[in-house]
């Protein structure tokens, strides 16, 4: 199926997606996000109802939401356009993968500066969300194994990410701030 052609939409809709998900662990939104099929996604607009919206928040067998798949398999403007549509339909940008990785962390790890800047500007985005290892996106960008990506750090700080020491959780930062205020 070509991403520029929505003539295959009827074929896509004929698939038994519940059976497909049971077999592959992916629903229609995971597949579309992975393949980068923006026109297919747009063609679904009138079909996404309250019954379908929970599919936008499901994890695939790999533990990713459709937004994680979009960030993993696409870059820059393509990822942004797909994610905009998925969010419009009801996907949640703050949902973490099954291994507790926020979508913002995926974009940081992939060095997708444009996507990171876009995510940081989204209403309600949690810039201080932590992954399984208690690292924020800012901490990931400033870690040595990511070559202390100064450009990424600057983007995150521009949009309000708070610099903190590696491994300190949000609560620890708040506690240390309270202690210094009371002294």
Swiss-Prot record:
InterPro entries: Ankyrin_rpt, Ankyrin_rpt-contain_sf, NF-kappa-B_inhibitor. GO terms for molecular function: NF-kappaB binding. GO terms for biological process: cellular response to tumor necrosis factor; symbiont-mediated suppression of host NF-kappaB cascade. The keyword Zinc does not apply. PROSITE patterns: ANK_REP_REGION, ANK_REPEAT. Residues 163-183 are annotated as: Disordered. Keywords: ANK repeat, Host-virus interaction, Inhibition of host NF-kappa-B by virus, Repeat. Pfam families: Ank (PF00023). ANK repeats lie at residues 62-95, 99-129. Suppresses the host immune response through NF-kappa-B inactivation. Possesses ankyrin repeat domains required for NF-kappa-B binding but lacks the regulatory regions required for dissociation from NF-kappa-B and degradation. Therefore, prevents host NF-kappa-B release and subsequent activation. Belongs to the polydnaviridae I-Kappa-B like protein family. This is I-kappa-B like protein N2. It comes from Microplitis demolitor bracovirus (isolate Webb).
């Amino acid at each position: 199926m070509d991403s520029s052609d929505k003539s295959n939409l009827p074929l896509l809709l004929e698939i038994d997606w519940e059976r497909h998900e049971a077999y592959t662990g992916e629903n229609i939104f995971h597949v579309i996000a992975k393949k980068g099929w923006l026109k297919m996604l747009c063609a679904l607009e009138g079909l996404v109802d309250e019954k379908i919206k929970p599919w936008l928040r499901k994890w695939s067998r790999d533990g990713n939401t459709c937004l994680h798949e979009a960030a993993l398999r696409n870059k820059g403007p393509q990822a942004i356009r797909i994610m905009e549509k998925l969010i419009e339909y009801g996907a949640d940008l703050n949902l973490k993968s099954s291994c507790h990785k926020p979508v913002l962390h995926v974009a940081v790890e992939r060095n997708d500066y444009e996507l990171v800047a876009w995510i940081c500007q989204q209403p309600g985005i949690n810039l201080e969300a932590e992954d399984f290892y208690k690292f924020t996106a800012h901490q990931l960008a400033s870690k040595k194994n990511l070559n202390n990506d100064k450009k990424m750090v600057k983007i995150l700080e521009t949009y309000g990410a708070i610099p903190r020491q590696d491994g300190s959780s949000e609560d620890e930062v708040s506690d240390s701030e309270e202690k210094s205020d009371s002294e």
